Regions:
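P-loop NTPase motor core of the ASCE superfamily
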Residues: 2, 23, 123, 128-132, ...
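P-loop NTPase motor domains
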Residues: 2-17, 25-27, 32-40, 45-309, ...
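H-loop/switch region of ABC-family ATPase nucleotide-binding domains
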Residues: 315
Length: 438
């Protein structure tokens, strides 16, 4: 039986209805779902799970769109685990992470990466996203993936700079991608072409106006590899503070990170079951980062589990999820469901999970730190129970400065060097001048 991560205590009634309490926990080799209103205690349980997993040497990751959880978490890493840590602070302008999604992708993986990037942009722009924009972006990413020394910053240049486009297309062999650029894009009337690419240009321009995003995704060199982290029980902590870098950049980075971990899991198909080291990724405010439709996400959860990637999806309220189908797909595919205090609307959606033992009034009236939970046991659905989450773990190690310095050294580049290379790449081509003969 696997060793459980301790969460707190649960109410237990003996045969004569005498109330007692016993400890309860979760197996990290399960998907999980955590919901709770602001101030209900949700962040504390995520934090305690992460600290225990790190202390035990588990492969663990965290995507934090607020920033406080990630900043706090690195203070609990013992010195023996510092070599395992990749700490990614998107607001660290001095040392941007060297992360190039397009670098060294095998040909059979390139379509998956393309769809992941397109899905992240689609998720970000929602209602303002159009078919033609998606069509152009898909073919741009596919072309850049086939070429050497490219990054996502090359998309706009590919659209507007013919010499650069020619240098990229000379390396593309996929007939469908080549057909788009030569038989479609190049044949468009110049005015129509400008109208067609303008929405994508505007969206890219708004995103890459952020120095944080530009300096991370605009690097050609890649030092960040989710597959290596997963296979070696790494510790990945991503701080994506929306208040500092903006909603758009934070959501895009989170969506791309989630996509990359999903793709890294799928790459394990060629590895034997015994070599698929379990890795658990905890995602706070996960609706900001989802790129799949409901049916596709249900498949994603099943595939991830098969290849040793387990997700805990946490958020505040169900209105953040844009369809009941997606909500049901999640509830049907997770082993552990933990509900803190929720609104009346959310209680109506969740009471089927905990019925008949617990209903709407129970979910609405929980105190801070109280939960109603359903935990899978030995592969079978558990019986719902009321519990109390343990208080915050307090044993800080005090090595945050060392962890930040080590992650900068191993996974990042100095800002001045990054910006020098990006400036050189984006510099306009020199104008041709005629020689004047005297």
């Amino acid at each position: 039986m696997p060793e459980l991560i301790t969460l707190g205590t649960r109410e237990v009634y003996s045969g004569n209805r005498v109330l007692t309490h016993s400890s309860f926990g979760i197996d990290l080799a399960q998907h999980g779902y955590v919901i709770g209103a602001s101030g209900s205690g949700k962040t504390n349980v995520l934090r305690n799970v992460l600290i225990q997993a790190i202390d035990r040497g588990e492969g663990i990751g965290c995507l934090d769109p607020h920033g406080d959880l990630a900043s706090d978490l690195i203070a609990y890493v013992a010195s023996s685990h510092i070599p395992d840590v990749c700490y990614f602070d998107a607001a660290d302008l001095a040392y941007p992470l060297s992360w190039n999604l397009l670098a060294s992708v095998l040909p059979d993986q390139q379509p998956l990466v393309t769809e992941g990037v397109v899905g992240a942009f689609r998720n970000l722009f929602g209602a303002s996203w159009g078919y033609r924009t998606e069509h152009i972006l898909r073919n741009a990413v596919a072309a850049l993936l086939a070429a050497d020394n490219t990054s996502l910053l090359g998309i706009a240049k590919l659209l507007t700079h013919p010499p650069y486009r020619a240098s990229i297309l000379n390396q593309v062999t996929d007939p469908v991608v080549r057909s788009f650029w030569y038989d479609e894009f190049e044949q468009w009337d110049p005015r129509f072409r400008q109208e067609a690419i303008a929405p994508l240009q505007n969206k890219l321009g708004a995103l890459f106006a952020s120095p944080a995003l530009r300096n991370i995704l605009g690097q050609v060199k890649n030092r960040f590899d989710p597959r290596t982290l997963m296979d070696n029980r790494g510790i990945f902590i991503a701080r994506l503070p929306k208040g500092l870098i903006g909603d758009g950049p934070a959501n895009l980075l989170g969506a791309l990170l989630l996509t990359q971990f999903q793709q890294a899991a799928l790459q394990r198909a060629s590895a034997s079951v015994g070599h698929r080291t379990p890795f658990h990724l905890i995602i706070d405010e996960f609706p900001c980062f989802l790129t799949d439709e409901p049916e596709a996400f249900a498949t994603t959860l099943a595939e991830a589990r098969k290849y040793g990637l387990f997700l805990t999806l946490a958020h505040q309220f169900t209105a953040q999820i844009h369809s009941n189908e997606l909500q049901q797909a999640i509830l049907s595919n997770v082993g552990n469901t933990i509900a803190f205090r929720v609104s009346g609307r959310d209680a109506r959606l969740l009471e089927d999970v905990f019925a008949p033992d617990f209903t709407r009034p129970h979910l609405v009236n929980l105190k801070r730190g109280e939960v109603i939970a359903k935990i899978q046991q030995d592969g079978a659905p558990g019986i719902p129970f009321r519990g109390q989450i343990a208080p915050p773990i307090q044993e800080r190690q005090g090595r945050s400065t060392t962890i930040i310095a080590e992650s900068r050294r191993r996974f990042a580049q100095p800002r001045a060097l990054v910006e020098e290379r990006i400036t050189k790449f984006l510099a306009p081509a020199p104008a041709l001048t005629k020689k004047v003969h005297h």
